[in-house]
Amino acid sequence: FIVLVICLSCLISFFLWNQNRAKGKLPPGPTPLPIIGNILQINTKNVSKSLSKLAENYGPVFTVYFGMKPTVVLYGYEAVKEALIDRSEEFSGRGHFPLLDWTIQGLGIVFSNGEKWKQTRRFSLTVLRNMGMGKKTVEDRIQEEALYLVEALKKTNASPCDPTFLLGCAPCNVICSIIFQNRFEYDDKDFLTLLEYFHENLLISSTSWIQLYNAFPLLIHYLPGSHHVLFKNIANQFKFISEKIKEHEESLNFSNPRDFIDYFLIKIEKEKHNKQSEFTMDNLIITIWDVFSAGTETTSTTLRYGLLVLLKHPDVTAKVQEEIHRVVGRHRSPCMQDRSCMPYTDAVVHEIQRYIDLVPNNLPHSVTQDIKFREYLIPKGTTILTSLTSVLHDEKGFPNPDQFDPGHFLDENGSFKKSDYFMAFSAGKRVCVGEGLARMELFLLLTNILQHFTLKPLVDPKDIDTTPIANGLGATPPSYKLCFVPV
């Protein structure tokens, strides 16, 4: 007991010293308690809402303590733009994320830093660009998968169904075709297991328990909890990816790379004599996991949430279908060239992403050097939270931001109107590496669904609730059922 008291006293003393040292440098914020910081002032079920209230008191730049470490929060378009776009290099670091630091070990694209991040990201973008111009382009793969999805939806026979599973299959298979060269049947056992891991991981990551884990990783890591399920899921995903890599190694043709794995294996071979090379087998595994994690569950959740919003707004859905049938017709599949002739549909796809606000607080950034931001001094390595909610729901960019209105992206002539406030994929040097892919998937999959089906709700549209059931790392829509009635 005495040892425990001494340890706690040391921690409190260190905390107070550290806090005093930072006074006059970091932005203002609520007074943190020793050890636990401001965790009692943060609603871990809806961090975004708590940050909104704090911004009312402390302005667009303030400091909160998740545990003992300070986090600088940037709230509103002006502050977020100044950091991520105007000063993108200084804010390009990836912030501390204890939940995944344990397993990722600083590898891959999403959670890496420095030269490892720059080289891996640059290489991955180049490969995706090359595949976009190949014999079988990324658009071809999405269109092919859209047809499989339509056939699967037809098999529901217009009966009530939960769309979660089927809307997860299509984006996951698109990633599979890019990474592994082949897609899976929707009843494939390995495929179903992989899908379940991604879905469960996102649900776990959005819980209050995980917010506490990130604040107190050393304390909670050894306690029972859902984080152990997540670690187990990730380990099984790594095993699945490793097996696919082994299969590729056995059939690799250096002069004819088939997919992302082949390109990466060739790069590893070319740099095998460079001991400082960032292209290793471990980095390949984590990079693939990053691409899957970022490209599967986010897109499928957006589709699932999008259909729920469209059920709530049948008038909007009817206008989209009219435009699809007028521009595309019924006898061919929509393609990306059609988008420029379909401003209303394009606006609806953008408004869905803005309205649902899928990643409310972005992934954490960090500053790569000591900087002066406005009148504050922010030390190198400080974690930065950029509130995407505050940008996507900014009244200056989107009048009546809490209303679902495709008019947010249309001008007075009905033409599509871009908005600098649209940061659904973040912005700057850490903008989502799969943004181009996700934009194609959302447009092509949604238009294919609405080309072939009328969405029939099981309740009156007025009674449909679109409020997320969880709002941690990601916004999770409530579960629902609908009928896909063939047109």
Curated annotation (Swiss-Prot):
Q: What class of enzyme is it?
A: oxidoreductase
Q: Where in the cell is it found?
A: Endoplasmic reticulum membrane; Microsome membrane
Q: What is its EC number?
A: 1.14.14.1
The protein's UniProt keywords, in alphabetical order, are: Endoplasmic reticulum, Heme, Iron, Membrane, Metal-binding, Microsome, Monooxygenase, Oxidoreductase
Instruction: Identify one Gene Ontology CC term for this UniProt entry.
Output: intracellular membrane-bounded organelle
What PANTHER family has UniProt attached to this entry? Answer: CYTOCHROME P450 2C70 (PTHR24300:SF200), CYTOCHROME P450 508A4-RELATED (PTHR24300)
**Family assignment from sequence similarity:** Belongs to the cytochrome P450 family.
- Identification of the protein by name: Cytochrome P450 2C21
Which species is the source of this protein? Canis lupus familiaris (Dog)
What phylogenetic lineage does the species belong to?
A: Eukaryota, Metazoa, Chordata, Craniata, Vertebrata
